[in-house]
């Protein structure tokens, strides 16, 4: 992953090619495995309470370790998938960029790049074109439910990708979003309650291994770093009963 992020040749490629390269490198066969594959690649994924205004963020540490931090507010599995792909885009495209130093226009530009990367990454063009050909009424949000289950991506994201590929007319696109708004699908889509939200497991498993095998007693860690249990739980997004 580090090599992908620091490969200067990537700057000469378009986002779709970079997304295809990343998907192949991570061996993503289905988006249902996205979180697992990201953790397997070396990315540390954590959950934290970041309030309602922040969905997720990502960073490279000074030791060149990639982290993705997800908000733990109630959110659908498909929206979490998009957050993960969006943050992967930042890790690969915007390596070590100081976000605080960017102008408003610069920040808007890199956010669009991360959004576009996520769409290309989650919905590979060739396969998506084949699957979309079965859609009969493209302006009807309910027509996208089978694709939502297959790709684990929101109805809105599916239609947007299709529209950008020229598969819907302007009028069809406008009618689609009018229907989406009228039915309240901007906030809650069909199937959102049926698709289980997968939580990060890598860091939890490492900590569980450390404590169960007494590699480092919990008290020793707390005393060494002068922290209390609640801080450690908050830092790694753990439940009260985990430690």
Language-model region placement:
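Active-site hotspot residues in diverse enzymes, especially metal/ion-binding acidic/histidine motifs
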Residues: 1-243
């Amino acid at each position: 992953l580090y090599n992908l992020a620091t490969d200067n040749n990537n700057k000469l490629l378009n986002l779709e090619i970079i997304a295809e390269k990343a998907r192949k490198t991570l061996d993503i066969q289905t988006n249902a495995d996205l979180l697992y594959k990201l953790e397997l690649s070396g990315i540390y994924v954590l959950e934290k309470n970041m309030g309602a205004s922040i969905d997720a963020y990502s960073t490279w540490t000074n030791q060149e370790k990639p982290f993705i931090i997800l908000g733990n507010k109630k959110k659908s599995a498909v929206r979490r998938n998009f957050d993960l792909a969006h943050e992967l885009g930042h890790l690969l495209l915007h390596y070590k960029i100081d976000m605080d130093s960017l102008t408003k226009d610069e920040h808007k530009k890199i956010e669009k790049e991360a959004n576009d990367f996520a769409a290309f990454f989650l919905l590979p063009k060739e396969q998506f074109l084949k699957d979309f050909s079965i859609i009969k009424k493209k302006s009807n949000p309910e027509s996208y439910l089978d694709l939502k289950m297959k790709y684990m991506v929101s109805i809105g994201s599916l239609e947007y990708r299709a529209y950008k590929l020229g598969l819907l007319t302007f009028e069809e696109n406008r009618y689609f979003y009018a229907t989406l708004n009228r039915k309240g699908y901007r906030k809650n889509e069909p199937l959102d309650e049926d698709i289980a939200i997968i939580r990060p497991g890598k860091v939890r498993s490492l900590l569980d291994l450390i404590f169960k095998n007494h590699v480092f007693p919990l008290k020793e860690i707390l005393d060494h770093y002068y922290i209390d249990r609640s801080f450690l739980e908050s830092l790694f997004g753990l439940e009260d009963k985990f430690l």
